[in-house]
UniProtKB/Swiss-Prot annotation:
Organism: Nocardia farcinica (strain IFM 10152)
HAMAP family per the UniProt record, alphabetical: IlvD
PANTHER family reported in the protein's UniProt record: DIHYDROXY-ACID DEHYDRATASE DAD (PTHR21000), DIHYDROXY-ACID DEHYDRATASE, MITOCHONDRIAL (PTHR21000:SF5)
Documented EC number(s): 4.2.1.9
MF-aspect GO terms: 2 iron, 2 sulfur cluster binding; dihydroxy-acid dehydratase activity; magnesium ion binding
Enzyme's top EC category: lyase
Task performed by this protein: Functions in the biosynthesis of branched-chain amino acids. Catalyzes the dehydration of (2R,3R)-2,3-dihydroxy-3-methylpentanoate (2,3-dihydroxy-3-methylvalerate) into 2-oxo-3-methylpentanoate (2-oxo-3-methylvalerate) and of (2R)-2,3-dihydroxy-3-methylbutanoate (2,3-dihydroxyisovalerate) into 2-oxo-3-methylbutanoate (2-oxoisovalerate), the penultimate precursor to L-isoleucine and L-valine, respectively.
Assembly notes: Homodimer.
Record bears the keyword Transcription: no
Positions of the UniProt region annotated as Disordered: 1-22
Residues that, per the record, bind [2Fe-2S] cluster: 57, 130, 207
Catalytic reaction(s) noted: (2R)-2,3-dihydroxy-3-methylbutanoate = 3-methyl-2-oxobutanoate + H2O; (2R,3R)-2,3-dihydroxy-3-methylpentanoate = (S)-3-methyl-2-oxopentanoate + H2O
Protein name per its UniProtKB record: Dihydroxy-acid dehydratase 1
InterPro entries from the UniProt entry: DHAD_IlvD/Edd, Dihydro-acid_dehy_C, DihydroxyA_deHydtase, DiOHA_6PGluconate_deHydtase_CS, ILV_EDD_C, ILV_EDD_N, IlvD/EDD_N
Amino acid sequence: MAEQTNTPDLKPRSRDVTDGLERTAARGMLRAVGMGDDDWEKPQIGVASSWNEITPCNLSLDRLAQGCKDGVFAAGGFPMQFGTISVSDGISMGHEGMHFSLVSREVIADSVETVMQAERLDGSVLLAGCDKSLPGMLMAAARLDLASVFLYAGSILPGIAKLSDGTEREVTIIDAFEAVGACARGLMSRADVDAIERAICPGEGACGGMYTANTMASAAEALGMSLPGSAAPPATDRRRDGYARRSGQAVVELLRRGITARDILTKEAFENAIAVVMAFGGSTNAVLHLLAIAHEARVELTLDDFARVGRRVPHLADVKPFGAHVMTDVDRIGGVPVMMKTLLDAGLLHGDCLTVTGRTVAENLAHIAPPDPDGKVVRALNDPIHPTGGITILSGSLAPGGAVVKSAGFDEDVFTGTARVFDRERAAMDALEDGTITAGDVVVIRYEGPKGGPGMREMLAITAAIKGAGLGKDVLLLTDGRFSGGTTGLCVGHVAPEAVDGGPIAFVRDGDRIRLDVAAGTLDLLVEPAELERRKQDWRPLPPRYTRGVLAKYTKLVGSASVGAVCD
């Protein structure tokens, strides 16, 4: 009888395609892509990338994938590279294309799962560079529960716009959206808009502020799914090539140690990610995406967890869209490890969580020994921007299933205003351009939820235009859709239940009074219950926008934003 061993099998799946007489044809196919007799005993590692030439966010991934493959080879594995899709939110914003953004997250996760399962690959390095590809890759890792390492493409460098008054201004993509609103109100010349347009994207990399991509890259590092320190360096920085090679080596080592994604993606790891997002004042999309990743990891995570962590973790980072700095500044002062060490020292992080290094969070940080916060980009705990986190979870009569607001940068906790109701975003944009939205209004944009939109479009075009028009602190916008990571101002999203499901937002009318209390975490429609019941009598939801194709399928499958808008 053969002696049993606890040594993990380095080929737990790929033996299905390499071993035995019956796999002669499969081996013949694999020989054609470079495998030989010496490779059959090597673990096969999928190197999945969302590289494309549509958006600068992903341009570095082809180069980084090669580095990952080099690392896999060096560690004794055999890499197998394949691609998946990616949608540019910056290009698809403000028109029909944005309906297809969030669904791309599901397509990415599904496509990676499909290839990994069909080809029986043993582990994966997952590379992504923009908003939906990051959570899509992490969802795939959680769903597959194999040895997996995530690698971010890196952020873009800020551009410098030379304006007509002779000044120079550091700009990112969000400045372009805000310039549109300013120009429409006569507050900026077309020449300055053109100067900003030409400067915002000086090269490759994801949008440079603490927008969704950088927020999710920071969250991935906090989760333990990417190498420590790998989130912050810019896309053009050659340190990324080193991280790529080490990521390839790390996944083979995870196989040797029998560590899979769900060993890392525990409830405590998600609390770490939430804490880092709160401290950075990151994108509200992180709520949606972390809920979805947790769902795939079979971890029970709810909006209450975000609220609980947010109440005890202070907002420490002065970063865009509401602050002064970008991700390259975070990198300059030591990267995400600076924030993590600050939180760990305060008892606000779980130091015993396992990571892709095979070490714990605390061990990684002790090895790196990051510097203390610089006091400008990241403040000390005793000098926070705000004593609670940069995202607030809301509930109340207008959002009984929950809602989300980026409270980072709020000047006042309470806003009470008069409803201006619009079915879908375009009508609201028209009203703003006509000058009929004024201070004190609550702009309600409904039928933009995951199912009703469909696709839960980001509202950056309208929010940036409101800010550019000088109304950012005087107009509250709320929607069952969502917002870009670049959104600032009085913006409440993810209102649940959504309008198409008969949530209270469906029954708001022009002239209703609405009250937001950020400190109390409440969002209320100040209308008598009896009146709301009368409004429901003859209500019918808007008909589906799409009856064929991917969004028709998505409409039938997608769940509420309050549980991550997952498709099960």
